[in-house]
């Protein structure tokens, strides 16, 4: 089999397309169960603001919060594989939990209220029920409609679980992320409900549709961010300044991955375990 080489290297990365044994991720040395969360925080002795990541997935938002200076003490998600990944990479509590369950919400808020002041509750409740992409497929055929109903309708009210944690824990601020479609015709009632409920809980609320490319990320998909700051506890939220006004000037996908060698699939007997990295080709990398 002939494999084209990258113009930057004569040594393309070859991937043997065979699924190996499942990788078992070891927990972070400083991970703890939900029962021990208050003691973990007490022993933490950190000056960093404490944050909670709801619907944390594998930990993308947790990583961003960590880089922003927060101490993420708790990440919650319903998927065991996501929590295993989160628990591997982050200290504190990575808790598998069904946030639609009142019992589980009570358990989480009870522990958090023993942890001292929480500065931020952040997270992105599942967006599939509000995504236009799902709605287009919803009308394709009966099988897709059934799949949509079974997988997504039960997730539609999880934003309420997010706000329940905010109301019970009273963090200084919250940050909710979702698709922009939640503020569009058809779902505006939910969007207005989020704003109204947060304001009744004592938060000043601001929402903005953010285009990632404007902030230096090579991605076109916009996301809606709803930021709330507790009146009397902290100053109003300030949105970040945009880096790019025009898409043509923004970073592109090629700017992000052009330093990577070509990835070749299929069965290759003489495949390589490693690849020599040529180094970054631009400032983004």
Model-predicted segments: where are they?
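Conserved Class I S-adenosyl-L-methionine
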Residues: 190-205
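Alpha/beta-hydrolase-fold catalytic nucleophile elbow
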Residues: 124, 177, 211, 227
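Flexible, glycine-rich beta-alpha linker
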Residues: 185-186, 214-217
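Conserved S-adenosyl-L-methionine
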Residues: 97, 180, 203-214
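Conserved beta-strand signature within the Rossmann-like core of class I S-adenosyl-L-methionine
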Residues: 172-176
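Core alpha/beta nucleotide-donor-binding catalytic domains of modification enzymes
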Residues: 20-170, 180-184, 188-192
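Short, solvent-exposed loop/turn segments at the edges of secondary structure
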Residues: 219-221
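S-adenosyl-L-methionine-dependent DNA methyltransferase catalytic core
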Residues: 1-70, 197-200, 223-285
């Amino acid at each position: 089999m002939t494999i084209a080489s990258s113009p930057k290297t004569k040594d393309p990365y070859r991937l043997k397309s065979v699924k190996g044994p499942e990788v078992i991720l070891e927990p972070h040395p400083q991970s703890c169960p939900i029962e021990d969360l208050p003691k973990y925080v007490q022993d933490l002795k950190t000056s960093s603001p404490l944050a909670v990541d709801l619907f944390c997935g594998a930990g993308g938002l947790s990583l961003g919060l960590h880089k922003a200076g927060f101490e993420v003490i708790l990440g919650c998600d319903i998927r065991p594989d996501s929590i295993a990944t989160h628990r591997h990479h982050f200290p504190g509590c990575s808790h598998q939990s069904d946030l639609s369950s009142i019992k589980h919400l009570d358990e989480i808020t009870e522990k958090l209220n023993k942890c001292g002041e929480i500065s931020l509750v952040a997270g992105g409740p599942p967006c599939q029920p509000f995504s236009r992409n799902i709605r287009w497929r919803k009308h394709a055929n009966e099988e897709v409609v059934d799949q949509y109903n079974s997988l997504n309708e039960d997730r539609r009210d999880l934003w309420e679980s997010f706000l329940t944690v905010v109301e019970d824990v009273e963090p200084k601020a919250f940050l909710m992320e979702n698709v922009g479609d939640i503020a569009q015709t058809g779902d505006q009632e939910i969007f207005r409900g989020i704003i109204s409920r947060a304001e009744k809980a004592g938060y000043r609320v601001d929402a903005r549709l953010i285009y990632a490319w404007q902030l230096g990320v090579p991605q076109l998909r916009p996301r809606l961010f709803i930021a709330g700051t507790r009146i009397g506890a902290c100053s109003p939220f300030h949105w970040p300044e945009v880096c790019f006004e025009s898409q043509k000037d923004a970073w592109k996908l090629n700017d992000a991955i052009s330093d990577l060698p070509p990835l070749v699939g299929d069965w290759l007997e003489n495949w390589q375990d490693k690849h020599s990295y040529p180094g970054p080709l631009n400032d983004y990398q």
